[in-house]
Design a protein with these regions (language model features):
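Surface-exposed, charge/polar-rich loops and edge strands
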Residues: 1-353
Length: 353
């Protein structure tokens, strides 16, 4: 998510920057009016029924995603699988925006484990064509977007996804919000209001990258008993591929082995949850993907100690989700995020998909 302090810069880039829709502050009705104005003046145009292939190139790597409307289903159906816990605050904001706009403004990101024949051959066929859009995104990412209107390909995609569960990669709060909004709006099973905009990535895609999120504790007790190491780099090397966490306090790095299967789960269950008690994680935890930033926060007194984590294994995350287990908030960070503004999905209950 774009930090609040950076929003003015994005708004200044263009009168049509998507943050005017997705991040309107409390002016939800203003966002709705802006969307309708963009439609009226032709800046936004409705496609015929379509799916989309999205390709991103970054750091010498490439990832392909399918963008489509995904049916909203409760977690109990075991088709859409969560892997992180959510909190109330973010959902209230997103629900207010959905109620005002009645539009799915940015895709939720899902991961799937395809059958051998799978979806990838379909995407390969589409990628041989000329893309509809080519653009450059943040951090030097290169994007291409293809429009898929062929009903034969639509049917092939539907068949490939039949009985295939999907894991929420990014957007737990937004998914639960979309489901709540769908139940409010209602409509028959094939109504547009029963779906959300989804970006779907094969778990075996070599360009699917997951990064760790480190924790800084604002207050609490020291955690000791680990193996002393010389530096942050040695700490990160020491936890790689192990059920272990790195710690930093009083200018001292350690590698601390954990009992269990997934380091972030064990860290919270064995250490952090005991410190939090009944308080929410936001009260005592700061999060960063930059280990050096975590060290600096501790040195500057922003926090009393840091915990470093290795990136979780995706198949392990999927396995836990299939077992109905969730990880602590901010256990995974999928990278690079899909840019907002490529495709929108109207949630009109009178539209049929």
């Amino acid at each position: 998510m774009i930090p609040e302090a950076e929003l003015p810069r994005y708004r200044a880039l263009s009168p049509h920057n998507v943050v005017r829709l997705t991040r309107p502050g409390s002016d939800y009705e203003g966002a709705a009016q802006t969307f309708e104005a963009w439609l009226s003046d032709g800046f936004l145009q409705a496609d015929e029924p379509a799916m989309y292939l999205h390709e991103v190139k970054f750091d010498g790597r490439q990832r392909r995603d399918l963008i489509a409307a995904l049916r909203l289903q409760p977690y109990e159906d075991r088709v859409v699988l969560p892997h992180e816990r959510t909190h109330r605050g973010p959902k209230e904001d997103r629900l207010a925006l959905l109620r005002a706009t009645n539009v799915s403004l940015e895709p939720l990101w899902f991961v799937y484990q395809a059958h051998v024949s799978g979806i990838q051959p379909i995407l390969d066929v589409v990628a041989e064509r000329t893309p509809a859009v080519i653009f450059r995104g943040p951090e030097g990412t290169e994007h291409r977007l293809w429009t898929i209107t062929d009903r034969t390909l639509h049917a092939a995609v539907h068949a490939s996804f039949e009985d295939l569960p999907v894991l929420i990669a990014d957007g737990h709060h937004r998914y639960e919000t979309a489901l709540a909004h769908s139940e409010e709006v209602g409509g028959p099973p094939d109504a547009a209001s029963r779906f959300t905009l989804a970006l779907l990535t094969d778990i075996n895609d070599p360009g699917l990258e997951v990064l760790p999120t480190h924790r800084v504790l604002k207050a609490g007790v020291a955690v000791t008993g680990g193996e002393d190491v010389a530096s942050l780099e040695a700490t990160l090397d020491g936890i790689h591929g192990r059920v272990a966490v790195g710690t930093y306090r009083d200018h001292r790095f350690q590698v601390l082995p954990m009992e269990g299967e997934v380091a972030v789960v064990e860290l919270h269950q064995q250490v952090i949850d005991n410190i939090l008690g009944k308080r929410s994680p936001e009260e005592l935890l700061l999060y960063t993907r930059d280990g050096s930033e975590a060290v600096r926060w501790v040195d500057e007194g922003v926090g009393v100690g840091a915990f470093f984590l290795d990136a979780p294994q995706l198949r392990q995350v999927l396995k836990l989700a299939q077992e109905g287990k969730t990880l602590p908030q901010k256990s995974t960070y999928f990278h690079p995020k899909p840019p907002s503004g490529m495709v929108f999905h109207r949630l009109d209950r009178t539209l049929r998909l």
